[in-house]
């Protein structure tokens, strides 16, 4: 009898056990649009709800908008036609969730990529008539758990949100899939994302970005599924948005502004750096071969080499001035580069850059994430930690720091010299056999600190960075101590790097630190998420191929190839003699070349790290060579 009454009560439960979720889409808006003071509905949502910026990714042709919608619906970074397209809708359908699609959703609209086959679809076309659209929304909720509405201008969005906040009692999300497009069809902005319904006011982040105020477009599908109490499929690479901290609007506006400035400044800065570096390096080489290193031409050539060494550090420091215009941003970068080039040598500049990177890594990589060289937020290649760009600069600078020193008090030193020759310096970091333990411990600590910042989970673990740094520094340690180095030592140091990666993964799991890439991969394998592993692997392979074939990469490789040919033809004896006079520089130079090889082999897009590491080493070699030979006679 009791069992019968229990069954009747169970059957009497309401059909809508899960919350009713409302998603509002509005394209081509920015943070400034949804924070206008004349939009009270959106202002209320910001005050009472959650907010973040969303990375739509770079505009990918032929249809950038469609690709973003496909990503929103897949929970993974995909393009139109990918097998993952519409995965969220498939999951919802299997879970018994009924879906409705309203508003500007007619034929040819990208909303079909988000919800390919909704249970209810109403192309009202009334994107500027919020009251009528809200009536259609209420009607859809009588039979559906999820309603997606696509609206038009910001004013219409605000009117609709004002009504929804008052009358809708479930989760509500405002998603801006794409920012305003530029004339060439690309974009340079992040988009706003707002949430309401949880009753608290906070910043948002996600496990994808692990960055306050930032989520990725592939996080939208997992966020919607979580709101509907539906488990995300194992193949989704995105993660649900989650609250992180109290709201500080200045953080959002600064991230939005720097993202735009970095996108606008990248082309002029990188073309200027590339063309300027080629002109300076090959021009100074011509002056050297012509015997014009004495006097003003030689000083200008050496200053130019130091300027080329300084630009990565200048890009780290320029955003600290909080520029608001791209012209001011570029001027700050140029001024900082010119000032840093006043330092006496490329090794010192590179060592200082490495020190700044280590300090930034220990404090959250704010400088790196805002640098135009990395510019994580919009591209979405990497959202946190140290990427290949500054990994190469860090390893190169850490090596060159071992060739620096303080002048030994000898009477024959020329006090007017701008740089004491390296052979007359007492090393600041490092040791050779018989020099005592203090220098050796200093060298070990310096190398360990660089490896720690590159690999520790809480700083944004980079498995390839740990392997590259470990291999490079072990080789450097042995060479600095005048111990032999062969392929067995290289293989052993690479193995030690992988051991370190596994140790960090175990420690991260035990202490609940930021998840490492290895931990994520092992977890995916344990859950049978082979599609996730395959998808990430294919995406990294594709990214590596695109980076390797990028015109900038090819031009950089061509420049280094030409420089190698010129050095082999005209400078080889002078280089050998220079390295023999400076054994510490010779030791780190050789270790750096090994490190470039390891970077290419064990990092996705490792060619970038290798190029920047090689830049540090080559400029330091040329500067030292030209400085020593400034009074040499002209060469035939």
Regions found by a protein language model. Name each.
Residues 254-377, 392-398, 407-409:
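Core alpha-helical transmembrane segments of integral membrane proteins
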Residues 450, 487-636:
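Long, compositionally biased intrinsically disordered regions
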Residues 18-267:
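Soluble extramembrane regions of membrane proteins in the secretory/endomembrane system
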Residues 345-349, 438-441, 482-495:
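Membrane-interfacial entry segments at the cytosolic side of transmembrane helices
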Residues 280-293, 338-343, 400-409, 476-478, ...:
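Alpha-helical transmembrane segments
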Residues 319-324, 454-463, 601-608:
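Membrane-interface helix caps and helix-loop-helix hairpins in membrane proteins
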């Amino acid at each position: 009898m009791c069992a019968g009454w229990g069954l009747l009560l169970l059957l009497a439960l309401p059909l809508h056990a899960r919350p009713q979720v409302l998603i509002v889409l509005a394209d081509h808006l920015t943070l400034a649009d949804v924070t206008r003071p004349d939009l009270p509905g959106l202002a209320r949502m910001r005050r009472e709800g959650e907010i973040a910026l969303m990375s739509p990714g770079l505009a990918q042709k032929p249809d950038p908008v469609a690709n973003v919608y496909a990503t929103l619906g897949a929970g993974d970074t995909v393009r139109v036609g990918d097998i993952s397209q519409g995965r969220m809708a498939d999951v919802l359908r299997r879970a018994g969730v009924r879906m409705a699609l309203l508003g500007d959703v007619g034929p040819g609209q990208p909303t079909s990529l988000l919800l390919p086959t909704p249970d209810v679809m109403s192309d009202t076309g009334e994107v500027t008539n919020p009251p009528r659209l809200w009536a259609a929304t209420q009607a859809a909720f009588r039979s559906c758990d999820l309603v997606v509405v696509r609206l038009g201008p910001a004013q219409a969005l605000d009117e609709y949100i004002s009504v929804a906040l008052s009358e809708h009692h479930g989760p509500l999300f405002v998603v801006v899939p794409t920012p305003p497009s530029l004339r060439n069809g690309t974009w340079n902005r992040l988009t706003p994302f707002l949430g309401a319904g949880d009753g608290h006011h906070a910043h948002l982040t996600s496990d994808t970005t692990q960055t306050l105020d930032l989520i990725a477009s592939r996080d939208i599908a997992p966020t919607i599924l979580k709101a509907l109490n539906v488990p995300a499929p194992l193949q989704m690479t995105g993660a649900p948005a989650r609250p992180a901290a109290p709201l500080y609007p200045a953080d959002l506006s600064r991230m939005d502004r720097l993202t735009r400035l970095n996108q606008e400044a990248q082309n002029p800065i990188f073309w200027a750096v590339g063309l300027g570096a080629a002109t300076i390096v090959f021009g100074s080489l011509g002056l050297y071969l012509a015997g014009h290193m004495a006097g003003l031409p030689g000083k200008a050539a050496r200053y130019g080499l130091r300027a080329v060494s300084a630009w990565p550090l200048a890009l780290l420091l320029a955003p600290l001035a909080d520029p608001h215009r791209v012209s001011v941003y570029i001027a700050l970068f140029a001024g900082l580069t010119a000032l840093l080039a006043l330092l006496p040598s490329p090794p010192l500049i590179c060592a200082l850059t490495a020190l700044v990177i280590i300090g930034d890594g220990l404090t959250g990589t704010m400088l790196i994430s805002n640098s135009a060289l990395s510019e994580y937020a919009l591209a979405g290649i990497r959202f946190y930690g140290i990427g290949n760009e500054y990994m190469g600069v860090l390893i190169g600078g850490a090596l060159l720091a071992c060739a620096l020193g303080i002048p030994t008090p000898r009477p024959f030193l020329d006090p007017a010299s701008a740089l004491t020759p390296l052979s007359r310096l007492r090393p600041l970091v490092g040791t050779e056999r018989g020099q005592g333990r203090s220098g050796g411990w200093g060298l070990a600590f310096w190398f360990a600190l660089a490896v720690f910042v590159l690999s520790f989970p809480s700083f944004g673990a980079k498995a390839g960075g740990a392997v590259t740094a470990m291999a490079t520094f072990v080789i450097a340690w042995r060479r600095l101590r005048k111990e032999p180095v062969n392929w067995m030592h290289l293989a052993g140091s690479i193995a030690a790097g992988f051991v370190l990666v596994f140790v960090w993964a175990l420690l991260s799991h035990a202490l609940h630190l930021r998840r490492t890439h290895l931990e994520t991969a092992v977890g995916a394998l344990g859950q049978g998420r082979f599609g996730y592993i395959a998808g990430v692997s294919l995406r990294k392979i594709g990214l590596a191929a695109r980076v390797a074939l990028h015109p900038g990469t090819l031009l950089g490789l061509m420049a280094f190839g030409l420089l190698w040919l010129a050095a082999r033809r005209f400078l080889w004896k002078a280089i050998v003699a220079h390295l023999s006079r400076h054994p510490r520089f010779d030791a780190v130079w050789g270790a750096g070349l090994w490190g470039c090889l390891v970077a290419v082999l064990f990092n996705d897009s490792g060619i970038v790290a290798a190029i920047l590491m090689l830049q540090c080493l080559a400029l330091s070699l040329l500067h030292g060579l030209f400085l020593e030979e400034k009074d040499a006679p002209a060469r035939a």
